[in-house]
A protein has these predicted regions:
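Cell wall/extracellular polymer interaction/catalysis modules
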Residues: 1-122, 129-140, 146, 152
Length: 152
């Protein structure tokens, strides 16, 4: 599996950090360093808002799914540019069928807001429009798929 992915760059999302802190990292595997970091929303489950992420792989759960993802094709959807996500683990195997995608949302700020949280998603890793442009530059330039790893 690993041989099929970009060996220089990985996207890491650390859901153990508060949503108001940068927790989505563009990581340089060759230099063992963070290239760029930003905020990312988490799923709130069946509530209107949750300070902490809710995790599930079930359809209609509104929860974030932990695990590794292959970033798939881009498309233009409800929130503009988005990338399909293909779950590679038992904890996120339903992501594609759940329509869990990587997309931006204008209410996700560019700067950290901690101790204040940011908005929630319905399970998608949702970033600011400017950070999605940074991700797009990496994804579109890569000859191999980029791996996204969401962990807690």
């Amino acid at each position: 599996m690993e041989k099929d992915f970009n060996k220089k760059i990985i996207f890491l999302v650390d859901m153990s950090l508060p949503s108001g802190k940068n927790r989505f990292f563009i990581y340089d595997l060759q230099n063992d360093s963070v290239i760029k970091a930003s905020l990312v929303a988490h799923g709130c489950g069946d509530t209107q808002f949750s300070f902490t992420p809710k995790f599930s792989n079930k359809k209609e759960s509104g929860c974030t799914s932990l695990g590794k993802y292959r970033i798939g094709k881009s498309y233009s959807g409800r929130f503009g540019l988005a990338y399909k996500l293909h779950g590679l683990d038992s904890t996120n195997s339903n992501a594609f069928n759940r329509n869990i995608v990587l997309h931006s949302y204008s209410y996700v700020p560019d700067e950290e807001t901690y101790p204040y949280p940011i908005c929630n998603s319905r399970g998608c890793p949702m970033v600011s429009p400017s950070f999605l442009k940074s991700l797009q530059a990496v994804i579109d330039k890569s000859k191999e798929p980029v791996l996204l790893w969401i962990f807690n």
